[in-house]
């Protein structure tokens, strides 16, 4: 009791002494006047640093003992907190950041029922994935010497604009059409390729100076933003919680896009920003958003920020970026609304009205229309990541619907590596004098990227063997992350089987997988459990997985913009990277190579474009082994299909049991609505396909496509020669009958 009364008296003296001051004093103002209030708190030490008692000392002596001994026998001063640890580098360099987390549903009751086919198990039963296929390869020392010689050759063989015969005139070659696949309007670039659109970008009309002056903010604002260089995040006047979150991520200096956009974002102005891949665009819009949310009303829960992305994986990644940056901001909440994940779980999350909602367009509209307690009336900021993709035809209808749902008075931020600045496509977004910030020249690859090209000529059948050869050459130990891009998901799946039979474990990522399988593939690749990931253009945008050393373009993309997004998965954030592209003889392939070489020649960065030489004799030997797997591959596909059918039947059985068990609850749920009818969705899909392929929309074509849709894409009946003969005979009979009637009528008329 005496101790507590002394402490109260000391506090009163300290308060009365500083009562007349106009400022709040700190300890450094007068260290002598700081009352000693913690004399009685010396016993509150942690369990790790318990004092070692000596038998000859009394309680009084123990209190006055200035030194204690911890469990390790080390002396510790009593006035120091034993749990305190000095952070020598201020958290700037000692980060253990290993990349963003890709976490889907947190399922509480996850039953043990098998949900996916074990493809690796099937391949293993057929003799694959055991030992790496051994094709006659030189010894390790000779390999290293060859690699060194090859690198020297590559440096000498830098491609010029006429490389690969780029100056030769060739007839346009038709590429095979890919199957249509509309999986939640995601980034599945599998439609028909048309070589005639290789010069589309050159033919596209450019905005006039008058149009740009009336639409954009004054050029002075943009130039001032890009010319102002911030050496640290402290100079951006950010709050301490945000700075602490950035420090934990290892962010020490803002990138050019962050330095330019953060001050404008904090001021509430609209932004249209573009920068090369891996330059930190996600943090560039997330930092000012979180900083502004520090000043939100504490007691009113409402959704204030919407972030739209074209793919589910990108949305999950952005949510993790935001959570890590806002880790120390109290009361900041995030919500996720993406397709493929648990709908009810997302509804419960959105009922709490999180501050920031990251979503894909389709699922966002679904929740706004059908989820109770979730509304967007208080939205203040709309962000569109990969905005050029979001403005394309595939998302147009949904984007227009979203813009009608959101308040017109809002801040809009558009970000992309290949930002389309056409004013015509931006008018629908209701932007208010947006500030246009383009850090790098448009359509430029990241710095420190080495772009290699392998000329295939007429050896398309050797591409799987070439892929195996390159992966072994670039990473024989399986310690590098390699991404392989293909045009079609069927090819991605087939390559996984082929490489598995050759003893190489790889993953796949495309729209035919469930969302759980997709996230599992990304996480396995991130943890190097699977060092090679074969994917479609679903993964070409936004995904930031650390230390991807190599990108291989197994199939050439259909445009240079998609090529930039693909190779942008490596050489991120100032790191070195390498891309290897298989180049065919089509004019489209040549056009993309020309654009890449031109970009390298015009840039002042350290990237380069070279021709890669390969051992075709060794690749042909590997191809013989691949061709011998023909029947085995078919057997694996058949067995996989059978297992899928069994799993599907089990799922339907379980679904039926649940419908019987929870019949009343299911029937009591209101029917979910959509802003388009089935007929409208079908017409929009057809028009979208026709416009993408640059074909005229006429009624005959539309009716044929609608008939195909109604018949589940089954082929319409085509007349045979026999049918034509029958039709001709029938028409001739009708003509004879008609002529006979005419002659009879004529005779009757003459008699009269």
From Swiss-Prot:
Domain (Helicase C-terminal): residue spans on this chain: 448-611
Renumbered ranges of motif Q motif: 231-259
GO cellular component: cytosol; nucleolus; preribosome, large subunit precursor
Entry's localization field: Nucleus, Nucleolus
Keywords per UniProt: ATP-binding, Coiled coil, Helicase, Hydrolase, Nucleotide-binding, Nucleus, Ribosome biogenesis, RNA-binding
GO MF, any single term: RNA binding
Function: ATP-binding RNA helicase involved in ribosome assembly.
Family indicated by similarity: Belongs to the DEAD box helicase family. DDX27/DRS1 subfamily.
Positions contributing to ATP binding: 275-282
Protein known as: ATP-dependent RNA helicase DRS1
Motif DEAD box location, chain numbering: 385-388
Domain characteristics, as noted in the entry: The Q motif is unique to and characteristic of the DEAD box family of RNA helicases and controls ATP binding and hydrolysis.
This enzyme's EC code(s): 3.6.4.13
UniProt biased composition (Low complexity): 219-228
Protein source organism: Vanderwaltozyma polyspora (strain ATCC 22028 / DSM 70294 / BCRC 21397 / CBS 2163 / NBRC 10782 / NRRL Y-8283 / UCD 57-17)
Start and end residues of each Helicase ATP-binding domain: 262-437
CDD domains reported for this sequence: DEADc_DDX27, SF2_C_DEAD
Gene3D superfamilies assigned: P-loop containing nucleotide triphosphate hydrolases
Record field: catalytic activity: ATP + H2O = ADP + phosphate + H(+)
Recorded name of the encoding gene: DRS1
Principal location listed in the UniProt entry: nucleus
Biased composition (Basic residues): 695-704, 733-752
Disordered, as annotated region: 24-82, 130-228, 695-752
GO BP: ribosomal large subunit assembly; rRNA processing
Subunit-structure text: Associates with pre-ribosomal particles.
Enzyme class (EC, first level): hydrolase
């Amino acid at each position: 009791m005496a101790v507590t009364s002394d402490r109260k008296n000391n506090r009163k003296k300290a308060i009365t002494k500083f009562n007349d001051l106009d400022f709040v004093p700190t300890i450094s103002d007068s260290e002598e006047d700081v009352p000693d209030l913690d004399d009685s708190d010396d016993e509150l030490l942690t369990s790790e640093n318990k004092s070692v008692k000596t038998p000859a000392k009394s309680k009084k002596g123990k209190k006055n003992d200035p030194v204690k001994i911890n469990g390790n026998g080390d002396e510790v001063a009593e006035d120091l907190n034993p749990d305190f640890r000095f952070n020598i580098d201020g958290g700037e360099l000692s980060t253990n950041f290993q990349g963003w987390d890709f976490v889907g549903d947190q399922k509480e009751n996850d039953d043990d029922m098998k949900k996916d086919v074990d493809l690796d198990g099937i391949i293993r039963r057929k003799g694959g994935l055991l030992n790496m296929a051994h094709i006659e390869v030189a010894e390790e020392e000779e390999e290293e010497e060859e690699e060194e010689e090859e690198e020297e050759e590559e440096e000498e063989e830098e491609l010029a604009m006429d490389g690969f015969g780029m100056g030769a005139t060739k007839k346009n070659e038709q590429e095979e059409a890919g199957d249509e696949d509309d999986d939640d309007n995601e980034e599945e670039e599998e439609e028909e390729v048309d070589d005639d659109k290789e010069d589309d970008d050159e033919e596209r009309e450019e905005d006039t100076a008058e149009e740009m002056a009336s639409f954009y903010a004054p050029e002075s604002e943009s130039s001032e933003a890009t010319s102002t260089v911030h050496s640290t995040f402290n100079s951006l006047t950010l709050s301490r919680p945000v700075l602490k979150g950035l420090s934990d991520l290892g962010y020490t200096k803002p990138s050019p896009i962050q330095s330019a956009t953060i001050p404008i974002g904090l001021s509430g102005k609209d932004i249209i920003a573009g920068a090369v891949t891996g330059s930190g665009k996600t943090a560039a819009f997330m930092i000012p958003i979180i900083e502004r949310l520090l000043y939100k009303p504490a007691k009113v829960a409402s959704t204030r920020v919407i972030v739209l992305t074209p793919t589910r994986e990108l949305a999950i990644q952005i949510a993790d970026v935001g959570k890590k940056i806002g880790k120390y901001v109290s009361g900041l909440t995030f919500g996720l609304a993406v397709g493929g994940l648990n709908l009810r779980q997302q509804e419960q999350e959105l009922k709490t009205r999180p501050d920031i909602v990251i979503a894909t367009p389709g699922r966002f509209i679904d929740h706004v229309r059908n989820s109770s307690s979730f509304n967007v009336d208080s939205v203040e900021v709309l962000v569109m990541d990969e905005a050029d993709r979001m403005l394309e035809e595939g998302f147009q209808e949904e984007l227009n619907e979203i813009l009608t749902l959101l308040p017109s008075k809002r801040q809009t931020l558009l970000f992309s590596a290949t930002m389309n600045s056409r004013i015509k496509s931006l008018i629908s977004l209701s932007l208010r004098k947006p500030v246009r910030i383009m850090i790098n020249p448009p359509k430029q690859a990241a710095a420190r990227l080495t772009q290699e090209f392998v000329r295939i000529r007429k050896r398309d059948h050797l591409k799987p063997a070439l892929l195996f050869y390159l992966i072994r050459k670039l990473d024989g130990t399986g310690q590098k992350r390699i991404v392989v891009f293909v045009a079609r998901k069927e090819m991605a799946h087939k390559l996984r089987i082929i490489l598995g039979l050759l003893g190489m474990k790889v993953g796949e990522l495309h729209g035919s997988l469930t969302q759980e399988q997709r996230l599992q593939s990304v996480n396995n690749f991130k943890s190097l459990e699977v060092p090679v990931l074969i994917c479609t253009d679903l993964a070409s945008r936004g995904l930031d997985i650390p230390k991807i050393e190599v990108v291989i373009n197994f199939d050439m993309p259909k445009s240079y913009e998609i090529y930039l997004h693909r190779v942008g998965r490596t050489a991120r954030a100032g790191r070195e990277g390498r891309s290897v592209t298989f180049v065919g003889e089509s004019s489209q392939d040549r056009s993309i190579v020309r654009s890449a070489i031109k970009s390298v020649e015009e840039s002042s960065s350290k990237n380069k474009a070279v021709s890669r030489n390969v051992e075709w004799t060794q690749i042909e030997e590997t191809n013989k082994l691949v061709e011998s797997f023909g029947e085995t591959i078919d057997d694996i596909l058949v067995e996989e299909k059978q297992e899928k059918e069994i799993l599907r039947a089990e799922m339907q059985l379980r679904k039926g049991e649940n419908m019987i068990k929870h019949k009343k609850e299911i029937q009591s749920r209101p029917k979910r609505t959509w802003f388009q009818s089935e007929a409208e969705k079908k017409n929009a899909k057809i028009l979208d396909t026709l416009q993408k392929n640059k074909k005229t929309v006429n009624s005959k074509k539309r009716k044929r496509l609608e008939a195909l849709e109604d018949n589940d894409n089954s082929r319409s009946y085509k007349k045979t020669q026999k049918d034509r003969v029958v039709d001709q005979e029938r028409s001739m009979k009708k003509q004879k009958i008609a002529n006979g009637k005419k002659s009879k009528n004529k005779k009757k008329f003459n008699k009269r």
